[in-house]
A protein has these predicted regions:
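Generic N-terminal amphipathic, Lys/Arg-enriched alpha-helix
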Residues: 2-5, 16-34
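Active-site pocket-lining/capping segments in soluble small-molecule metabolic enzymes
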Residues: 17, 166, 196-203, 261-270, ...
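Glycine-rich tight-turn/loop motif centered on a GG-T
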Residues: 26-37, 101-104, 122-134, 206-217
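C-terminal accessory subdomain/extension
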Residues: 300-393
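Conserved, mostly hydrophobic/aromatic
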Residues: 41, 63, 94, 160, ...
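Active-site-proximal beta-alpha core segment in soluble small-molecule metabolic enzymes
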Residues: 58-204
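Active-site loop/helix belt of alpha/beta enzymes
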Residues: 157, 163-282
Length: 393
């Protein structure tokens, strides 16, 4: 049993986080805040650019970086005009702020949402709609978008979602894909924009016995067969200019030539939440943190109704010695500084004042900051107001 006894994880604070804390206090920030480190973000952008093979395009995944300022900065540093968007508000916002940007839908939008896009798009940025590629996954959806094109008298560029092994919908080469391509070709207001094949399942497959390698070959074969099938319908000239979109942050490094994909999508690897701590993304560094003020810092942990067990709990687990209550909480995130902080499973989570416990060497006062690393960026970033950009103190 002593083998299972937790060791004390508390200790001195990380100098990096003390510097960020100093900057937050100097800026007068006193509420839960999403912090993005510009130096680290830029390093991640440069890492991504460095891994792209010659001729490979890059598309920014807007849902993973849900801030126009952030997207604009990444566009400038990468020189890309390509974005992947995922819902109606995002599509409208980017169409107005960046009407010249190419937007590829990352999931098929219900046709009613696409209709609302055309209804709500301001006249002065009407041309932004010509830069949108609408994702379609079934023959039925192609027909819905054909009717929409007629309704608004607009030409729509359709991108076909391929199932390259994720099995989250999309189509495989064969009869159904043939019907979709034929329907697009037959309609005067529809054009074939290309394919999207998303493969985030790859890194979770074991490398043992060649499983991952086989799956990657499967991705490439499915994509290659779809390209051949589309070439038979539209001809070589039309195929030369299509979008061949692939990957995501977890797999962009596996595309080492432009034989299959002409562009890769990525977003999360630029801020690197914990779900992206994978071997392929090891060269990327965490660049986003939740910073939240300490409301109360207590020298001893007392559990409501279980006070009789407090001493025994501390003796068994030194990391339960002290308590802090933070401003807010219950985020998809893990505490990273001060070191050794843990959620209290017995007390439970709280969105108002979350309890965190630490060991005997935990030193933090009210109004100082606890730092947490988000698990993902897309949902977590949107829970905060303006992003605080940190750079060299």
């Amino acid at each position: 049993a002593l083998m299972m006894k937790p060791g004390d994880k508390s200790g001195p604070r990380d100098a990096y986080f003390l510097d960020v804390q100093k900057a937050l206090i100097a800026a007068g920030i006193a509420m839960p805040t999403m912090v993005v480190d510009r130096t680290r973000l830029n390093a991640n952008i440069d890492t991504l650019k460095g891994f792209l093979p010659p001729g490979m395009g890059y598309r920014i995944v807007a849902k993973s970086l849900p801030s126009l300022g952030l997207i604009d900065h990444i566009r400038k540093r990468t020189g890309t005009g390509r974005l992947m968007t995922f819902n109606l508000p995002m599509l409208l916002e980017i169409s107005q702020a960046m009407p010249e940007a190419s937007q590829l839908l990352g999931k098929p939008l219900p046709v009613q949402a696409a209709r609302q896009y055309f209804e709500q798009l301001p006249l002065e940025v009407s041309g932004a709609a010509d830069n949108v590629q609408w994702l379609v996954d079934t023959p039925e959806r192609v027909m819905q978008y054909a009717a929409l094109a007629d309704e608004f008298g607009r030409e729509l560029a359709l991108n076909v979602e391929l199932d390259v092994g994720l099995h989250r919908g999309g189509v495989v080469p064969g009869e159904v894909l043939g019907a979709m391509l034929a329907a697009i070709k037959a309609h005067p207001r529809l054009s074939f924009a290309g394919f999207m094949g998303y493969d985030p399942h790859i890194p979770s497959l074991p490398t043992a016995m060649g499983w991952r390698e086989r799956a990657m070959k499967g991705v490439r074969k499915t994509y290659a067969d779809a390209l051949v099938q589309a070439g038979g319908v539209f001809g070589a000239d039309a195929m030369a200019g299509i979008t061949r979109n692939a990957a995501g942050s977890p797999t962009y490094r596996t595309y080492q030539d432009t034989e299959i994909a002409s562009e890769v999508s990525a977003g999360s690897c630029l801020v690197k939440p914990t779900h992206f701590d994978t071997e392929l993304l090891e060269p990327h560094v965490p660049a986003s943190f939740i910073a939240t003020p300490v409301i109360k810092s207590l020298p001893v942990t007392h559990m409501p109704g279980l006070e009789f067990a407090d001493g025994a709990t501390r003796a068994w687990n030194p990391n339960a010695s002290k308590t802090v209550f933070i401003y807010g909480g219950n985020w998809l995130a893990d505490p990273v500084d001060p070191p050794g902080l843990e959620y209290n499973k017995t007390f439970g989570r709280s969105s108002n004042q979350e309890m965190l416990n630490g060991g005997p060497d935990l030193e933090i006062s009210p109004d100082e900051f606890v730092f947490l690393r988000p698990h993902q960026s897309e949902a977590v970033f949107l829970q905060f107001g303006d992003i605080a950009v940190y750079e060299d103190g």
